[in-house]
């Protein structure tokens, strides 16, 4: 039997560029994640991890950056030997302009990892750029996050990197609030504002469509059952047609007033249904919860 191929995403880049947000996004999509791993421990870490489930494919994301104190130049050398472990390794480098990084540090009041060297913040950023330049040069993708907010960065990671780009149709089920606008990239948009709203139940108001109490409430509503049944039938028919038409990526968006209860519930339910139907590349994104 041919051993399974494993996917490894290596996240590196400048401090303050959004690496932690990216790693958390991969974790939310069921990647096994580890942050601040020294390069020299990477082979040992992967050998142990792959032995845990050696008969199944593994999706792993790790963060390696200036905090590890390792010789970062060894990372690219190791990446090219990963195929011997039957691992497809991808290096992503997160970057941002100096002005953006300075503003983010001012907003968060966090210390730069190199500040212990007695450097000013601009000097620390400049030194980090110099030390990580070989990784930036070797990366398969450089993601400049200067113009991204948190929501845009998470969505970019999901659509561009977290879902496998292959001959399979990748599905993203998204929730949103109409008051903040319809996602322009959505292929299908469904309006859930006609459905009963858990917001008006005081005990449910602080919860979201991910919570069991909200799910229980929604599943007791006849209109919700009818709505889900009809949309499920529609998508079961047309998603298969879209894959046959060589589409590689489809976004299905559900909207409600606040983007917290109904739309989240529907996106989660449709994602679960899609996985049960055999779609392997499925993700959810809840714009107003991020």
UniProtKB/Swiss-Prot annotation:
Alphabetical keyword list: ATP-binding, GTP-binding, Nucleotide-binding
InterPro entries according to UniProt: P-loop_NTPase, RapZ-like, RapZ-like_N, RapZ_C
Gene3D superfamilies, per the entry: P-loop containing nucleotide triphosphate hydrolases
Family according to the record: Belongs to the RapZ-like family.
Residues binding GTP: 65-68
Keyword Isomerase in record: no
Annotated ATP binding sites: 13-20
GO MF term (any one): GTP binding
Protein name: Nucleotide-binding protein Xfasm12_0753
SUPFAM superfamilies per record: P-loop containing nucleoside triphosphate hydrolases
Domain of life per record: Bacteria
Function noted in UniProt: Displays ATPase and GTPase activities.
UniProt xrefs under Pfam families: PapZ_C, RapZ-like_N
């Amino acid at each position: 039997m041919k051993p399974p191929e494993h996917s490894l995403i290596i996240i590196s880049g400048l401090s303050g560029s959004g690496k932690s947000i990216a790693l958390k996004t991969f974790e939310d999509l069921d990647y096994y994640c580890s942050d601040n791993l020294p390069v020299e421990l990477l082979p040992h870490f992967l050998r142990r991890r792959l032995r845990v489930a050696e008969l199944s494919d593994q999706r792993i994301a790790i963060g390696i950056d200036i905090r590890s104190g390792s010789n970062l130049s060894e990372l690219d050398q190791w990446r090219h030997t990963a195929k011997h472990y039957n691992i497809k390794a991808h290096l992503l480098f997160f970057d941002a302009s100096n002005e953006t990084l300075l503003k983010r540090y001012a907003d968060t009041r966090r210390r730069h990892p190199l500040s212990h060297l007695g450097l000013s913040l601009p000097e620390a950023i400049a030194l980090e750029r110099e030390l990580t330049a070989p990784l930036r040069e070797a990366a398969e993708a450089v993601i400049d996050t200067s113009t991204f907010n948190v929501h845009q960065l998470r969505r970019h990671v999901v659509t561009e990197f977290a879902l496998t780009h292959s001959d399979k149709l990748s599905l993203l089920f998204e929730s949103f609030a109409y008051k903040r606008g319809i996602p322009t990239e959505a292929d299908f948009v469904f309006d859930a504002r006609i459905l009963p709203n858990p917001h008006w139940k005081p005990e449910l108001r602080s919860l979201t469509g991910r919570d069991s109490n909200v799910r229980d409430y929604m599943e007791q509503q006849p209109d919700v059952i009818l709505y889900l049944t009809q949309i499920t039938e529609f998508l079961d028919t047309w998603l298969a047609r879209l894959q046959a038409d060589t589409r590689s990526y489809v976004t299905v968006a559900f909207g409600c007033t606040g983007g917290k209860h109904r739309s989240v519930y529907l996106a989660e339910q449709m994602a679960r249904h899609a996985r049960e139907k055999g779609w392997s590349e499925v993700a959810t994104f809840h714009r107003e919860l991020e």
